[in-house]
A protein has these predicted regions:
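A cytosolic-side transmembrane-helix exit/cap motif
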Residues: 132-137, 217-221, 260-262, 288
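Hydrophobic transmembrane alpha-helices
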Residues: 45-47, 53-63
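Interfacial loop-to-transmembrane junctions
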Residues: 36, 256-274
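Membrane-interface amphipathic/juxtamembrane segments adjacent to transmembrane helices
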Residues: 40-48, 142
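Selected transmembrane alpha-helices and immediately adjacent juxtamembrane segments
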Residues: 1-31, 38, 111-208, 269-288
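Cytoplasmic-side transmembrane-helix entry/capping segments in multi-pass membrane proteins
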Residues: 45-46, 83-88, 266-271
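Membrane-interfacial helix-loop connectors
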Residues: 58-113, 188-259
Length: 288
């Protein structure tokens, strides 16, 4: 019972910390929907296919709420699959402050961010330019040259207050995130971090494949765990990169919540793991 309450308390604390940004993000979305929908459509029509570049740069902001916003925009066909992929790849959320707290790792942090931006841009370009003509429409989704409706939720209320509308959508997502955080926290409380670290240490060259899988867990705490394992020497730089590349914070959870196409969600999840694992294994050959 104590294990249950500890996991629930941790989930509540993590979720409450995220609430202010999520609310501000949804408040911004509501405002954009009601006042700048047409201008956003015109801007996207003029160069929406290159959105993966700003997506890669903005994804480096150390918080996981931005990936949630990107998921909403993708589900609303406002941004391309390459853009949301770039945001997911570039997202590192809580790992950045943790690594920045170690002066000896500042060079590593700069290298990590540079590599993530580079892989995010390349991955977004591949998905949006050459692969767009190969992938079936049912898997691709997202922006198609026009924005039918700039809407980041399932429902939109023109007559309601934007503050109340943003609060309602924030609370809806908060409940979904809280459930994920509680389940993951319960697993960590039950098994502990040491067995996880031991399993990672014995993986060798295939370690990035496992850390990328761990990184898919839609919880900001996972990036902290990966950063701590790297600081403690339990995983390599390539494995850290793989986990943080596959880790999109709560972005994946929100994507599965708001995007109705399970095929697109599964494709994006699998692609994110593949990019993280492949990039991490590539970086394994470097003395980092």
């Amino acid at each position: 019972m104590e294990l249950f309450f500890d996991a629930l308390l941790d989930a509540l604390i993590d979720g409450v910390k995220m609430l202010p940004f999520l609310y501000l993000a949804y408040l911004l979305i509501e405002w954009l929907e009601r006042h700048h929908g047409e201008s956003i459509e015109e801007a996207l029509a003029g160069g929406g296919r290159w959105g993966f570049i700003p997506g890669a740069l903005l994804g480096c902001v150390p918080q996981c709420g931005f990936s949630a916003v990107a998921s909403n925009l993708y589900a609303s066909r406002v941004i391309t699959p390459g853009t949301v992929l770039a945001v997911f790849i570039a997202t590192s959320d809580e790992a950045i402050p943790l690594l920045a707290a170690e002066p000896s790792l500042w060079v590593t942090l700069v290298l990590l961010l540079a590599c993530k931006v580079a892989f995010a841009i390349v991955g977004g370009w591949l998905l949006d330019i050459p692969l767009r003509h190969i992938l079936p429409h049912s898997l691709y989704g997202g922006y198609e040259g026009h924005a039918d409706e700039v809407d980041c939720h399932e429902e939109h209320e023109e007559t309601s207050s934007i503050f109340l509308a943003a609060l309602r959508h924030t609370l809806e997502i908060f409940v979904f995130i809280l459930l994920f955080s509680f389940i993951i926290g319960l697993v960590f409380e039950a098994f502990g971090e040491e067995p996880i670290a031991a399993a990672l240490s014995g993986m060798g060259v295939f370690q990035p494949m496992l850390t990328a899988l761990v990184g898919l867990v839609p919880n900001c705490a996972v990036s902290v765990l990966l950063a701590q394992l790297y600081v403690q020497g339990a995983i390599t730089f390539g494995s850290l990169f793989a986990g943080l590349t596959a880790g999109a914070g709560v972005g994946l959870a929100v994507l599965w919540r708001v995007n109705p196409s399970w095929k697109q969600n599964l494709f994006m999840t699998g692609l994110l793991w593949a990019v993280g694992a492949a990039a991490g294994m590539l970086l394994q050959i470097l003395p980092l």
